[in-house]
Amino acid sequence: MLAGAAACQTAPPGTSAAAGPRVVLEEAEAWRSVASERDAVALDGLAERWRQALAAGRAANLSRRIAGEGELLDPEARLARGAPAPGSYRCRYVRPGGRKWVSSAPGFCYVGVEEGQLTLATELRGLRFGGYLWELKGGERLIFLGGAVPAGSRTPPAYGDNPSRDAAGLVERIGEFRYRLTLPEPAPGAGLTVVELVAAPRD
């Protein structure tokens, strides 16, 4: 089951962080010693990616769709206590920057804990991955670093083992028991995938 996939990973290996003055996500954080330069640059440029994606969507006459998502597609929406509690979540994703509206069917995500660090795994058609969450200073946001699950497999590669399958994003709380994971595409100028996570009712 993918719900436990993130917990099956070995701790991701350290790689060199991006150098230079391009720091948007606060001062140096622990995640930078793990993230690739490519992913650090993409995360540092997330505000501009949001601007470009929303502008492209509105230019494609998708303003009503964007507005209908409320806080999910409001890059300024962020609440304190950003870390999601361990457990199951209903989730789906949208991609706001294309010529056509892209929204996935609902699926499930799972937040766990391994050796004191939060893990996240998704089970969505076309978006299956698992990895670790790194809390930023202040506690309002977390960095996700993980890997996409290969076809025919149940477990994602550890972050850094296969750079072509690496995934990096930003987690924020946007409502009661509601979170957002924003995944910038690694290529410069590419779009965004925004995953909504809503805590599933407990039986």
Label the model's feature ranges.
Residues 4-7:
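C-terminal motif of bacterial Sec signal peptides marking the signal peptidase cleavage site
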Residues 9-84:
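Amphipathic/hydrophobic helical signal segments and adjacent flexible N-terminal regions
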Residues 64-71, 159-203:
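Edge beta-strand at a domain terminus
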Residues 123-130, 147-152, 183-190:
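Short, solvent-exposed aromatic-acidic interface loops
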Residues 128-135, 153-158, 190-196:
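A short, polar/proline- and glycine-enriched secondary-structure boundary/capping micro-motif
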